[in-house]
Amino acid sequence: MLAVRKARRKLRMGTICSPNPSGTKTSSEVCNADWMASLPPHLHNLPLSNLAIPGSHDSFSYWVDEKSPVGPDQTQAIKRLARISLVKKLMKKWSVTQNLTFREQLEAGIRYFDLRVSSKPGDADQEIYFIHGLFGIKVWDGLMEIDSFLTQHPQEIIFLDFNHFYAMDETHHKCLVLRIQEAFGNKLCPACSVESLTLRTLWEKNCQVLIFYHCPFYKQYPFLWPGKKIPAPWANTTSVRKLILFLETTLSERASRGSFHVSQAILTPRVKTIARGLVGGLKNTLVHSNRWNSHGPSLLSQERS
């Protein structure tokens, strides 16, 4: 989903990981878990902003807690409705937009992660949680899962895009940034010129993690990249035709230098969409009914492209 330079330059991805019995990989076997390490040498010195990098939307939302309070990202009307029995079960069907854990996404080749976070009412430990209507797992648990993968795959580079913050004051931000530091340590890549970042330079510095932080708080830490360095225009439509047109237009209009660019190939349900498919949920209402064709990927956040 992070499409930089040419969205149509697709990376040739193989099986998630299917080594042959001898334990070695043949030239025809590409392990998605190590696809960056497997790129041909002539791409190692190419700026990362010239690669098309797969990503996921609401990356953390493979699990949400229907027993938790409704998140601060929801309106008061939704919060009042949630007092009714079964409403949160229905909310869960529309809040879950992924079916793979962080680890499973990484092993499948995903390298860009769309992250929304929040404090939780009544939580005395100042923990920060992922949020999408309902609260997900603790951010710390997700970061540790990602770091474990990176330690085992030292040539893979990831983009963590913290783009929505809810119910967070300065203390919460400091807690979150400390967690990020504790989780990744020297793997964090300091903010610098986008054009200077290549696979080779990152490998030489043992850097694997770029953190984008859409909040002025980024100025206090050298390893936090400003959100403006990774714009992510949003089509906000249920129409596949309008989405494709939007993606083509925004890609052609993006800045040629100085930033990455996210192409959000996702359909967004409207209120009437949710009302019509209330019980069926996102997967049955949008994902199954909208496909490119028999040869193309789904546009929905339920699947990655």
UniProtKB/Swiss-Prot annotation:
GO terms for biological process: lipid catabolic process; signal transduction. Residues 42-215 form the PI-PLC X-box domain. It is found in: Nucleus. The keyword Hydrolase applies. The gene is PLCXD2. Widely expressed. Disulfide bonds: none annotated. SMART domains: PLCXc. Keywords: Hydrolase, Lipid degradation, Lipid metabolism, Nucleus, Transducer. Gene3D superfamilies: Phosphatidylinositol (PI) phosphodiesterase. One of its GO terms (cellular component) is nucleus. Catalyzes the hydrolysis of inositol from phosphatidylinositol (1,2-diacyl-sn-glycero-3-phospho-(1D-myo-inositol), PI). Could also hydrolyze various multi-phosphorylated derivatives of PI, such as phosphatidylinositol-4,5 bisphosphate (PIP2), releasing inositol-1,4,5-trisphosphate (IP3) and the protein kinase C activator diacylglycerol (DAG), therefore mediating cell signaling. Its main location: nucleus. PROSITE patterns: PIPLC_X_DOMAIN. The keyword Hydrolase applies. It catalyses: a 1,2-diacyl-sn-glycero-3-phospho-(1D-myo-inositol) + H2O = 1D-myo-inositol 1-phosphate + a 1,2-diacyl-sn-glycerol + H(+). This is PI-PLC X domain-containing protein 2. One of its GO terms (molecular function) is phosphoric diester hydrolase activity. PANTHER family: PI-PLC X DOMAIN-CONTAINING PROTEIN 2 (PTHR13593:SF32), PTHR13593.
